[in-house]
Design a protein with these regions (language model features):
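Extracytoplasmic
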Residues: 56-59, 66, 76-80, 84, ...
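Glycine-biased, low-complexity coil/linker segments
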Residues: 11-13, 36
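Second-shell loop/turn segments in exported
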Residues: 76-84, 115-122, 126-130, 138-145, ...
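A penicillin-recognizing enzyme superfamily signal
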Residues: 138-153, 178-288
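Beta-lactamase-like hydrolase cores
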Residues: 38-76, 151
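Active-site-proximal helix/loop microenvironment
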Residues: 72-88, 161-205
Length: 290
């Protein structure tokens, strides 16, 4: 997927390409320093580049400034409408569980198909961090077994998510099924809030899991396509809501850099699993970065 470097205005107002000897900062690093018109030019350039190199309508995306929450670029039909988001809801189910159990998270043995996981052979012994990294359905079935929609309402409000259906319970609250729908825009902002609350109980383990996901979990395709920066990633696969139905749609949310995110990218790819959506997200970030 060839492309020309994405230009970003310098502080002096001229444009610089990735080959400029004076350009030692990445576009992502520059975004945190750029204000006003220059930030707007970055957003315009990002939108043009993403739509040029990823033109297919099978790909939906939202690119946000991680500090302000401003949408920098987007191509997503009705992004304010609630839809199933699959395992992207697992971190918030974990927070809801923590609020009910003093943030003590149990370990669990995932035995694969026999304990309801997507990985037939299972993940073995997992804790919250590794369960997030590998999106272990077995762990989250165990974690949410005693949760009801009412238990999740406070967490949904705290992070600005749509509430699950009143009679949703158990694994439905971990994004398995369609009983907890939320809007793509709302979910993107919920992840930004998760990062802002990184010092709160339970959140650190979740973010550590997202960092591990980007390196060696279900989001590892992000790092393979975009190796120049550490990232936070979470993947998911959910029921397709396109008019042209597929068995499912893949989702990936990525924040870079991991230690102080400057941008968030939420991607949906029609008819593929979440790991493949992570690869698309990594390719998009590589384009923006360079």
């Amino acid at each position: 997927m060839g492309s020309s470097p994405l230009p970003l205005p310098s502080r002096g107002g001229s444009t610089v390409g990735s080959q400029s000897a004076s350009s030692e900062q990445s576009n992502v690093e520059r975004l945190s320093a750029e204000k006003g018109g220059n930030s707007s030019l970055f957003a315009q350039s990002a939108a043009q580049a993403l739509n040029r190199d990823f033109p297919g309508r099978d790909i939906s995306f939202l690119l946000l400034d991680a500090h302000t929450g401003r949408v920098l670029a987007s191509r997503w039909d009705n992004p304010d409408n609630p839809i199933p988001m699959g395992s992207l809801l697992k971190p918030f189910a974990a927070v809801a569980y923590g609020e009910q159990h003093d943030y003590h998270y149990p370990n669990h043995t995932c035995r694969g198909t026999s304990t309801g996981c997507w990985l037939p052979r299972g993940h073995g012994e997992v804790d919250l961090t590794t369960a997030v990294a590998h999106s272990c359905n077995s762990y989250f079935r165990m974690l949410t077994a005693g949760l009801t929609a009412d238990d999740v309402f406070a967490t949904a409000t705290r992070f600005g998510l749509d509430r699950p259906e009143l009679d949703a319970s158990g694994a439905e609250l971990a994004g398995l099924g369609t009983r907890w729908r939320t809007s793509p825009v709302g979910l993107a902002h919920a992840y930004l809030e998760l990062v802002r609350e990184r010092q709160q109980p339970g959140v650190r383990q979740i973010l550590d899991g997202m960092a591990l996901s980007a390196r060696d979990g279900t989001g590892a395709q992000v790092h393979r396509a975009f190796p120049s920066a550490d990232a936070l990633a979470k993947t998911g696969t959910a029921t397709c809501t396109h008019s042209r139905r597929a068995p499912g749609d893949g989702f990936s949310v990525v924040l870079v850099p991991a230690d102080d995110p400057q941008i968030l990218l939420l991607v949906r790819v029609h008819g593929v699993p979440g790991a493949q959506a992570a690869r698309t997200a990594g390719q998009m970030l590589h384009l923006i970065e360079n």
